[in-house]
C-alpha cells in the first residue's frame, strides 16, 4: 500500500465521521455570515525579479515522523513573515501530519497573509468546512480525485469564494488540471506513492503551464540553490515547509514581500 492510499483510506473514514457529526445543512446555514477570502492567487503572482514564498506550517510528515517537537504555529508563522512570505500553508490533516484546524484558525486570526488549508479534500463537505474554518484557499490533489470530482469541487470552491491550488505530479495530471480550468497549478516534486522527491519534476512540467496561470513548485526545496533553480525556471511561487525550519541556507534567502 502506498503512502497516498493509506492516507486516503484513513481520510475517507474521517470524512464519514465528519458528515455524521455535521450534515451539509450545518455548513450551508452558516455560509452567509462569512467575510471575503484574502487574495491567495493575486499574492502569488510573480514579481519582476523574484519568486514568491508560500511558507508551510507543518509539525510532522508520514515519511519523517515528528519534524518540530516544540511546535508553536504562531511563532513559526511570525518567523516566516520576517523572511518575506507572501502566504501561509497550514497542515490540518491530523493523523499522518499531526495538523489541526485550530492551527489554521490561530494563524488566520493573527496575521494578514492569505492561508492555504493543506489537507486531503475528498468530499464537498470539506470545502464548506474549509471556508468556515477561515481558509482563503484549499488544495485539490489530482491523484486523489477523478476528473469529474476535480471539476465539481473546483467549481464549488470558487462559488464559496475560496481560491484553489490544484496539485499535479506528471503530464497526465497537469492536462486534467488544465482541462478543469485550474488557475493555480502546484507541481509536487514529491511522489505521493512513495514520498521520494525529485526537484526536476517541476523543471520538466513548468513549460507546459500556460501564461496567466499561477505556477507553484512544491516540496523538496532544501537550499538557496534549489530556490534559485525554480526562480530561474520562472515559477511564480515556491511552497516550502521543512526546509525553512531546518536549513540555515534557506533562512538567508531574501523573499519578495507582498
UniProtKB/Swiss-Prot annotation:
Pathway: Amino-acid biosynthesis; L-tryptophan biosynthesis; L-tryptophan from chorismate: step 4/5. GO terms for molecular function: indole-3-glycerol-phosphate synthase activity; phosphoribosylanthranilate isomerase activity. Belongs to the TrpC family. SUPFAM superfamilies: Ribulose-phoshate binding barrel. The keyword RNA-binding does not apply. It catalyses: 1-(2-carboxyphenylamino)-1-deoxy-D-ribulose 5-phosphate + H(+) = (1S,2R)-1-C-(indol-3-yl)glycerol 3-phosphate + CO2 + H2O. GO terms for biological process: L-tryptophan biosynthetic process. The keyword Cell membrane does not apply. Its EC number is 4.1.1.48. The gene is trpC. HAMAP family: IGPS_B. This is Indole-3-glycerol phosphate synthase. It comes from the Bacteria. Keywords: Amino-acid biosynthesis, Aromatic amino acid biosynthesis, Decarboxylase, Lyase, Tryptophan biosynthesis.
